[in-house]
């Protein structure tokens, strides 16, 4: 997670340093801010993973949308649900506009594949489970509290449905914004986000939704 967070932050910082606008002096060194933001994101990550997100279950989708809207708004984003037969997509836009700058649209998805609990090597596929490899190279469960302790082993892994595909990247994106704010940095490009609710079903309706909201989603890069 930290490697991707570093990439996201450095991309924004590089753009910010090349931008014409000036920023307030950083209040914390960037490496420390990135580490702090990554660590602070773990409780939210665990919370989001606890929400079932079966792509065919409209109630699952609505619960995830509610959580995600609150999380993006907490970072100052403006959000809007895009209607999609009871399983809306979520659009978010950072309101700070940079005159003359490019606009980047980030695509992620929050739905997941159906779960067969008996096929999982843990009690609950929706409960974040911390694991490490034992002497035989097998994954074994350890206390999740370790994730919130003073020392986190980079070789540990969090197992749960959609932990890497694709809820992890969403939480990393939010943590990257937290790190930027902690250093008084702002992206020098305009930021839009589209969160798909049906990627695991082949995104069968995203074309229709995108066409209906062409101007809202307009960007220079995806």
List where the protein language model places each region:
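Alpha-helical transmembrane segments and their juxtamembrane interfaces
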Residues: 12-13, 74, 206
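Bacterial N-terminal signal peptides
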Residues: 6-16
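Acidic/His- and Gly-rich active-site-bordering loop/insert found
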Residues: 22-163, 170, 180-189
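Positively charged n-region of N-terminal signal peptides that target proteins for export
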Residues: 1-4
């Amino acid at each position: 997670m930290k490697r991707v967070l570093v990439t996201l932050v450095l991309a924004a910082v590089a753009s910010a340093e090349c931008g014409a606008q000036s920023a307030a002096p950083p209040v914390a060194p960037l490496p420390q801010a990135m580490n702090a933001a990554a660590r602070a994101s773990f409780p939210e990550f665990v919370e989001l993973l606890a929400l079932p997100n079966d792509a065919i279950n409209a109630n699952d989708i609505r619960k995830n949308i509610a959580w995600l809207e609150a999380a993006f708004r907490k970072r100052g984003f403006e959000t809007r649900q895009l209607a999609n037969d009871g399983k809306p997509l979520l659009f978010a836009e950072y309101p700070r506009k940079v005159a003359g700058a490019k606009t980047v649209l980030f695509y992620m998805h929050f739905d997941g594949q159906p779960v067969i609990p008996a096929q999982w090597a843990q009690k609950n596929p929706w409960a974040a489970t911390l694991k490490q490899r034992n002497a035989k190279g097998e994954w074994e469960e350890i206390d999740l509290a370790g994730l919130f302790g003073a020392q986190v082993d980079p070789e540990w892994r969090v197992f749960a449905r959609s932990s890497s595909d694709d809820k992890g990247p969403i939480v990393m994106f939010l943590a990257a914004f937290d790190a930027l704010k902690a250093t008084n940095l702002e992206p020098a490009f305009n930021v839009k986000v589209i969160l798909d609710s049906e990627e695991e079903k082949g995104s069968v309706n995203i074309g229709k939704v995108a066409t209906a909201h062409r101007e809202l989603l307009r960007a220079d890069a995806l």
